[in-house]
UniProtKB/Swiss-Prot annotation:
Name of the protein in question: tRNA pseudouridine synthase B
Organism: Thermotoga maritima (strain ATCC 43589 / DSM 3109 / JCM 10099 / NBRC 100826 / MSB8)
Gene Ontology BP annotations: mRNA pseudouridine synthesis; tRNA modification; tRNA pseudouridine synthesis
Gene for this chain: truB
Family: Belongs to the pseudouridine synthase TruB family. Type 1 subfamily.
Keyword Ligase: no
SUPFAM superfamilies hit by this protein: Pseudouridine synthase, PUA domain-like
Molecular-function GO term, any one: tRNA pseudouridine(55) synthase activity
Job of this protein: Responsible for synthesis of pseudouridine from uracil-55 in the psi GC loop of transfer RNAs.
Amino acid sequence: MKHGILVAYKPKGPTSHDVVDEVRKKLKTRKVGHGGTLDPFACGVLIIGVNQGTRILEFYKDLKKVYWVKMRLGLITETFDITGEVVEERECNVTEEEIREAIFSFVGEYDQVPPAYSAKKYKGERLYKLAREGKIINLPPKRVKIFKIWDVNIEGRDVSFRVEVSPGTYIRSLCMDIGYKLGCGATAVELVRESVGPHTIEESLNVFEAAPEEIENRIIPLEKCLEWLPRVVVHQESTKMILNGSQIHLEMLKEWDGFKKGEVVRVFNEEGRLLALAEAERNSSFLETLRKHERNERVLTLRKVFNTR
């Protein structure tokens, strides 16, 4: 049984949950989940957790994402995308210079209102379910960050660009906000998620077309996941204690990367096995001071233990 992360490709049409179901069916395991919804009309990278890999999905939801999007100026739909009912069509008498200026004005932080039709929850219910029942919930705006925008291409009313965003940013809302700034509204007509953190569309796998063996072979093992997090190595004899829930004291550590208090670190044994994720109680720079004064204090607090054998 493999545990880890699969970089899946979601084609246009299926839901993110459909991708999860396909992996469950082909790998014959129930423990499968995804790390961030991708709209049915969109395609691209969908991070899938398999078995104990489902327990680290929260760390993928916090990563930057890159999208390619095409929007149509002057078209307004109830969902902010091409699948929704058309609410209004307007003339959009603006120059290319004005379009570019409006697009680039969103680089940086801004308060974004989530679309009424989205997978976001309100009192335990998905917004899109409430909207279909005629219950439109106006959520408060959320501060999001647009890190950069590039590859802007303008062909009449259709405008495409690439954008790198913070987690929780709705590209549909960004398109509509750009459209409103231009005075004509806009709707996303094509959307591709090109990357999630370090994982790109080039390495993604279409699970609907892949055989079970290929899917299994493409699972990234836990030991190679979350490589952006600091790493510590404990002495081999500490393995059993940590797997049984013992907190990590200084004497257990053999070596470590630099980390700050409050950071999550990956805990390995000398065999290279990932034992746990833990939260740092101290800055790593202070550990040598503790060692010098022979103070065997707790330095890491367990967050998740991975007993995969």
